[in-house]
């Protein structure tokens, strides 16, 4: 055992003052002194439970004691009679064993590989013990879940990630997936439940037993987001549902996650064998699959961007050469060749490294270095976390904890530890780059830059000076450019730029100027880029990104030249620079139906309980996707319709995630309304109106939303803080509004307008579906029925969606007096024009003026309300383009007119998109779009001017 260093001997005196009664400095062994000095977690635990210290002093922890965990826990739970006492015993048992593991680890009494095994067995023992106790309790209450043949059905739990691999770290979340074999009902209970309901309730109670903080702490933070469909999917799935999902919808990243999946408490029974056999083909392909390398490279890029976004430094898990890169190296071989090589199918990393050596897939020396680095990094990670039982992989900045880690890693001091760490991580990084690499080299050779460009940047030539590299510019442009450079350098003098930042900037700027000054619009482009550079000069990471990745710099210049809106976004949110690294994704937005899944994967990296990080992640994802959509728009790869489609799908993914987050927060506080006990879903819907409802969102569009529920009047919630069910939905809607509008360092998510709800701003924020139907039928104005034409459910249960669709269809197919409707629609349009019309009389407001977009929308809405009672098919779509198609198909409007209005509509909307990209208002010269305006005005007179 390494003697305590001087700082630790000094700290021991603080420890002595806190020792539990009955223990003195002289009565403790040297081992106890060392552990209690090293770990505040161990010290706090034995102060609360002195008998644990006596137990450790009399009998040190053993390497194989994990074999006794199940028996010890069974004894601890013998007298448990309710959920509260179960939760207490689970927490005390976990803490007691964790102190024993911390003791053995700090003193190196047990090998590091065995420590990982002990931590994983402890978690598995607690999960299985809690499940079995709660399963029996639920069976007593509701009966035993059985299939149609009367065979009892178990709850199977997949442990994912390091838990599944038997490599859990000291303070870790646990990633779980719940499954049960076959559908059926419970038998022998006081009331019969569907198996899905039984296992959902059991799963909820199990999560609460493990995850909910009490005065005794918690057992483990439980993360269920790896299950199919994430938080929006069922908590527990049948085998059939699991199989369907992974066969038809399983993503690459889910396949990688499933490599480590292991059934908790697996006793190799028929159900366990069936589940394993079902999942194996999804994970391990029969053919050699080299697409894995690019997929893993993409995942690594996502992690590198996350490190930059969160400002993570000294992170031994996610940093270059860290634990995650070793895991990626091993997964490459598992996923490429695992289908053909059973020895590569191990869930654990170290046995897989042995197989890689045996199969000669990597040089033996590389594998030796990876093994040594992995064990070194995992020991360092566990020691770091055992100091305070805290989930962290970031090296400490304070002297005490650095001294603790140096002692725990058997080094003389902190610099010696850092030296060893640096060597191990460099070895890992080398193997990683050779195998997976990045799309561009980490350190590309410095381009040869001519001396004149350095002169332009570093010497700040005077306006009268001449240099050949600027000779192609007109005199005024040259003066403007040199003034911009001089002003930028003056601005930099006010910033606290360190030596490294200055060095990188001096490498970057000559290259940037070389590219910018080759453009005709050099001064304009530079004026858009310098605010961004001024914002990141103190964040060397982003300067290095632009310096080391010439492609990223090229795309930055091109996009800023094309759009001041993009330049402004990049200046406000520099984290978006990461998106410039991969042109393959930059100019190809996410598939319209994949936004939800991309967002779900993105949010998995953020702790579920960290609301602040969740809010930031949502905003960062939205900004990154907006950048990609705008880049594709500028490049001409997206039509105006496709731009709006992408913006709308993105907004819907955001709504989905915000509702999920708000729901989880509300249920944690109040439980859920009891009318949901007997059914699936949440009894809640979000209806999109206006541009969202009509699939016509622009870059800066608000969201027009209303909220519906189907909660009966007398329902309460089932949580410890019981509230009225309808009050629950009101607070849910308020929470959703809050999550959208909260301003973080990444801005707000969307401006949300809920004034289209029944009775407008004076009405309730959330309305029951029945009240909504009654309002629409008996109180709503014609303009509210017009708004309903462009409305659709963007989030909600199928039951509520059907209810809303039926109300909408009923209202729209109601027979109306043509003259009255014509007058009311026309008068509403005139009223709008007087309030919103263009204040610049010499300009044409594309949206609000006569012959503009709003006129086309009113024509479409009028014709649907006028003729839907005769042609119900007119109610099918909520977007103007398809409504115009329906009007032609149903003989209301001739095909030529419908096509002409569609072309005018898309042309005007395209112009609005491009004006937004240029940060210009939505009006143009009066001479513009005269053909389109004349056509729209003629159509307006035809349909809406009284004869």
UniProtKB/Swiss-Prot annotation:
UniProt cross-references to Gene3D superfamilies, sorted A to Z: 1.20.120.1510, Beta Polymerase, domain 2, Glutamine synthase adenylyltransferase GlnE, Nucleotidyltransferases domain 2
Recorded GO MF terms: [glutamate-ammonia-ligase] adenylyltransferase activity; [glutamine synthetase]-adenylyl-L-tyrosine phosphorylase activity; ATP binding; magnesium ion binding
Entry keyword set: ATP-binding, Magnesium, Multifunctional enzyme, Nucleotide-binding, Nucleotidyltransferase, Transferase
E.C. designation(s): 2.7.7.89, 2.7.7.42
Adenylyl removase, as annotated region: 1-440
Reaction(s) catalysed by this chain's protein: [glutamine synthetase]-O(4)-(5'-adenylyl)-L-tyrosine + phosphate = [glutamine synthetase]-L-tyrosine + ADP; [glutamine synthetase]-L-tyrosine + ATP = [glutamine synthetase]-O(4)-(5'-adenylyl)-L-tyrosine + diphosphate
UniProt-annotated stretches for the region Adenylyl transferase: 450-947
Cofactor: Mg(2+)
GO aspect biological process, one term: regulation of glutamine family amino acid metabolic process
One cellular-component annotation, GO: cytosol
Keyword Cell inner membrane carried by entry: no
CDD domains, per database record: NT_GlnE_GlnD_like
InterPro entries xref list: GlnE, GlnE_rpt_dom, NT_sf, PII_UdlTrfase/GS_AdlTrfase
Top-level taxon of origin: Bacteria
HAMAP family: GlnE
Record family assignment: Belongs to the GlnE family.
UniProt xrefs under PANTHER family: BIFUNCTIONAL GLUTAMINE SYNTHETASE ADENYLYLTRANSFERASE_ADENYLYL-REMOVING ENZYME, GLUTAMINE SYNTHETASE ADENYLYLTRANSFERASE
Role noted for this protein: Involved in the regulation of glutamine synthetase GlnA, a key enzyme in the process to assimilate ammonia. When cellular nitrogen levels are high, the C-terminal adenylyl transferase (AT) inactivates GlnA by covalent transfer of an adenylyl group from ATP to specific tyrosine residue of GlnA, thus reducing its activity. Conversely, when nitrogen levels are low, the N-terminal adenylyl removase (AR) activates GlnA by removing the adenylyl group by phosphorolysis, increasing its activity.
NCBIfam families recorded: PRK11072.1 (NF008292)
Protein name (Swiss-Prot/TrEMBL): Bifunctional glutamine synthetase adenylyltransferase/adenylyl-removing enzyme
């Amino acid at each position: 055992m390494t003697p305590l260093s001087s700082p630790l001997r000094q700290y021991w005196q603080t420890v002595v003052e806190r020792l539990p009664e009955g223990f003195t400095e002289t009565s403790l062994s040297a081992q106890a002194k060392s552990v209690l000095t090293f770990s505040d977690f161990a010290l706090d635990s034995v102060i609360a439970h002195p008998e644990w210290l006596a137990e450790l002093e009399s009998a040190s922890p053993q390497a194989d004691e994990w074999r006794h965990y199940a028996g010890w826990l069974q004894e601890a739970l013998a007298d448990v009679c309710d959920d509260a006492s179960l939760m207490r015993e689970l927490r005390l048992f976990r803490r007691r064993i964790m102190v024993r593991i911390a003791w053995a680890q700090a003193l190196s009494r047990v090998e590091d590989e065995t420590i990982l095994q002990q931590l994983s067995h402890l978690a598995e023992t607690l999960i299985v013990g809690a499940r079995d106790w709660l399963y029996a309790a639920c069976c007593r209450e509701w009966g035993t879940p059985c299939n149609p043949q009367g065979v009892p059905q178990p709850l199977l739990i997949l442990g994912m990630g390091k838990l599944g691999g038997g490599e859990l770290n000291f303070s870790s979340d646990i990633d779980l997936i719940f499954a049960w074999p076959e559908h059926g009902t419970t038998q022998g209970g006081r009331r019969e439940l569907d198996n899905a309901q039984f296992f959902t309730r059991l799963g909820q109670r199990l999560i609460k037993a493990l995850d909910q903080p009490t005065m005794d702490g918690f057992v483990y933070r439980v993360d269920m987001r790896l299950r199919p469909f994430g938080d929006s999917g069922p908590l527990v799935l049948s085998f059939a549902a699991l199989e369907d999902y992974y066969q038809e919808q399983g993503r690459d990243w889910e396949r990688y996650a499933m490599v480590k999946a292991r059934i908790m408490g697996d006793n190799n029974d028929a159900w366990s064998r069936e589940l394993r056999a079902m999942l194996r083909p999804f994970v391990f392909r029969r053919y050699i699959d080299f697409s894995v390398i690019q997929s893993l490279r993409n995942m690594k890029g996502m992690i590198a961007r996350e490190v930059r976004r969160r400002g993570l430094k000294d992170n031994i898990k996610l940093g270059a050469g860290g634990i995650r890169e070793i895991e990626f190296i091993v997964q490459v071989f598992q996923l490429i060749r695992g289908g053909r090589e059973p020895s590569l199918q191990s869930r654990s990393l170290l046995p897989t490294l042995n197989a890689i050596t045996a199969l000669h897939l990597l040089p033996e020396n590389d594998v030796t270095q990876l093994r040594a680095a992995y064990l070194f990094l995992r020991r360092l990670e566990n020691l770091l976390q055992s100091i305070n039982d805290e989930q962290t992989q970031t090296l400490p900045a304070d002297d005490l904890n650095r001294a603790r880690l140096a002692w725990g890693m058997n080094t003389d001091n902190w610099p010696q530890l850092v030296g060893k760490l640096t060597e191990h991580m460099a070895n890992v990084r080398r193997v990683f780059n050779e195998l997976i690499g990045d799309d561009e080299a980490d350190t590309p050779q410095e381009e040869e830059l001519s001396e004149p460009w350095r002169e332009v940047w570093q010497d700040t030539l005077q306006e009268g000076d001449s240099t050949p590299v600027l000779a192609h510019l007109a005199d005024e442009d040259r003066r403007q450019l040199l003034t911009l450079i001089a002003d930028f350098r003056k601005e930099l003098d006010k910033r606290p730029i360190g030596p490294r930042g200055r060095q990188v900037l001096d490498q970057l700027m000559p290259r940037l100027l070389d590219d910018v000054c080759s453009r005709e619009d050099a001064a304009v482009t530079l004026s858009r880029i310098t605010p961004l550079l001024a914002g990141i000069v103190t964040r060397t990471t982003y300067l290095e990104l632009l310096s080391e990745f010439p492609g990223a710099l090229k795309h930055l210049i091109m996009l800023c030249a094309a759009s001041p809106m993009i330049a402004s976004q990049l200046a406000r949110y520099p984290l978006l620079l990461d998106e410039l690294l991969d042109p393959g994704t930059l100019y190809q937005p996410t598939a319209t139906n994949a936004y939800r899944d991309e967002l779900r994967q993105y949010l998995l990296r953020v702790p579920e309980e960290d609301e602040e990080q969740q809010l930031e992640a949502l905003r960062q994802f939205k900004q990154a996707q907006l950048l990609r959509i705008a880049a594709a728009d500028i490049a001409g790869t997206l039509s105006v319709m496709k731009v709006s489609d992408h913006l709308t799908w993105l907004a819907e993914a955001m709504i989905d995630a915000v509702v999920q987050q708000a729901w989880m927060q509300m249920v944690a506080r109040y439980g859920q309304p009891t009318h949901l006990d007997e059914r699936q879903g949440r009894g809640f819907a979000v209806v999109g109106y206006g541009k969202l409802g009509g699939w016509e969102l622009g870059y800066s569009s608000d969201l027009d939303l209303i909220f519906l529920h189907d909660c009966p009047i007398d329902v309460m919630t089932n949580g410890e803080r019981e509230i009225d069910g309808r009050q629950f939905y009101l607070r849910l809607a308020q929470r959703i509004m809050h999550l959208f509008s909260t301003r973080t360092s990444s801005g707000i998510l969307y401006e949300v307008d809920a004034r289209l709800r029944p009775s407008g701003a004076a009405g309730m924020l959330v309305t029951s579906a029945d009240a909504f139907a009654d309002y629409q039928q008996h109180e709503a104005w014609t303009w509210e029925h017009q708004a309903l034409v462009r409305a659709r459910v963007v989030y909600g249960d199928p039951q509520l969606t059907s209810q809303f669709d039926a109300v909408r269809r009923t209202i729209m197919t109601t027979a109306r007096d043509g003259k009255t409707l014509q007058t009311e629609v026309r008068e509403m349009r005139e009223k709008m024009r007087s309030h919103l019309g263009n204040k610049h009389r010499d300009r044409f407001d594309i949206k609000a003026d006569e012959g503009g977009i709003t006129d086309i929308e009113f024509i479409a809405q009028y014709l649907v309300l006028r003729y839907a009672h005769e042609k119900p098919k007119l109610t099918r779509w909520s977007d103007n383009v398809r409504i115009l198609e329906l009007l032609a198909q149903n003989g209301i409007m001739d095909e030529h007119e419908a096509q002409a209005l569609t072309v005018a509509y898309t042309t005007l909307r395209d112009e609005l998109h491009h004006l937004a990209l240029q940060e210009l208002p939505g009006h143009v010269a009066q001479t513009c779009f005269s053909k389109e305006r004349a056509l729209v005005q003629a159509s307006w007179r035809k349909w809406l001017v009284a004869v």
